[in-house]
A protein has these predicted regions:
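Polar, enzyme-active/binding microenvironments
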Residues: 1-147
Length: 147
């Protein structure tokens, strides 16, 4: 099995064993020393570098497939903070869509549709129980519960 082109930890991922997507993260030997923009696709035997995300981050929420993924938040170590950005991948490019109400990292996420038109991001750094829903209708986020 081929290794990834860019070694990293705290990365986002989507897809299946035979068709995956890996994006963002931090240097494997020193997480927190600089975030990575890189996106790579897996075809079951090798990794290929494709178009990068717009915002480099570590510990972001992610879900979807290798042709339709979504990523939420994450830490941006260049600015020593968390971001509130949400980006969607369409199989070719990443596009920033509706942002989270509060920037945070290391939360959980999931989607119920293969095209990521409905997804949630919950919890995260700062011991929050906040849950936000992303809906493709107008590409907006709404807070379901927050504290």
């Amino acid at each position: 099995i081929a290794d990834m082109n860019t070694a990293r930890a705290a990365l986002g991922g989507a897809g299946t064993q035979g068709a995956a997507l890996a994006f963002n993260g931090g240097p494997q030997a020193n997480v927190g020393s600089g975030s990575i923009y890189n996106t790579e696709t897996w075809n079951g035997s090798s990794w290929t570098e494709v178009n990068n995300t717009n915002t480099a981050s570590e510990g972001a929420g992610s879900s979807g497939s290798n042709t339709s993924a979504i990523t939420f938040g994450g830490s941006i170590y260049a600015s020593s903070g968390s971001n509130n950005r949400t980006e969607q991948y369409n199989g070719t490019n990443w596009t920033e869509v509706a942002n989270l109400s509060t920037g945070r990292a290391t939360g959980g996420s999931g989607s119920s549709e293969s095209d990521n038109k409905s997804a949630i991001y919950y919890g995260g750094a700062g011991n929050t129980n906040s849950t936000e829903e992303f809906t493709g209708a107008g590409e907006t986020t709404k807070t379901i519960a927050s504290s």
